UniProtKB/Swiss-Prot annotation:
Example of a GO MF term: toxin activity
Keyword list, A-Z: Acetylcholine receptor inhibiting toxin, Disulfide bond, Ion channel impairing toxin, Neurotoxin, Postsynaptic neurotoxin, Secreted, Signal, Toxin
Protein name per the record: Three-finger toxin W-IV
Main location: secreted
Subcellular location per the Swiss-Prot or TrEMBL entry: Secreted
Cysteines engaged in disulfide bonds, as pairs: C24-C45, C38-C62, C64-C75, C76-C81
Family: Belongs to the three-finger toxin family. Short-chain subfamily. Type I alpha-neurotoxin sub-subfamily.
Organism: Walterinnesia aegyptia
Pfam families: Toxin_cobra-type (PF21947)
Domain of life of the native organism: Eukaryota
InterPro entries membership: Snake_3FTx, Snake_toxin-like_sf, Snake_toxin_con_site, Toxin_cobra-type
Signal peptide limits: 1-21
Length: 83
């Protein structure tokens, strides 16, 4: 718990030092929630979901990628909007 709190504080400080940058969740469905500051003036976060034989996979990150047919994509423009 302390590690997670420290990580969030560090990410917040880094984001504030760089000016207003977008903060997005960046984990896959099988991992614990994490966030990242988007670089290069990126202005969108995404959540991508697709079915597999073992269940639905969810991937999150910065940007708004092009996806193949059958993959659900949600792009958004506010901090941590891709949960």
């Amino acid at each position: 718990m302390k590690t997670l709190l420290l990580t969030l504080v560090v990410v917040t400080i880094v984001c504030l030092d760089l000016g207003h940058t977008l903060l997005c969740h960046n984990q896959q469905s099988s991992t614990s929630p994490t966030t990242t500051c988007c670089s290069g003036g990126e202005s969108k976060c995404y959540k991508k979901r697709w079915p597999t034989h073992r269940g639905t996979i969810t991937e999150r990150g910065c940007g708004c990628p092009t996806v193949k047919k059958g993959i659900e994509l949600h792009c958004c423009t506010t901090d941590q909007c891709n949960l």
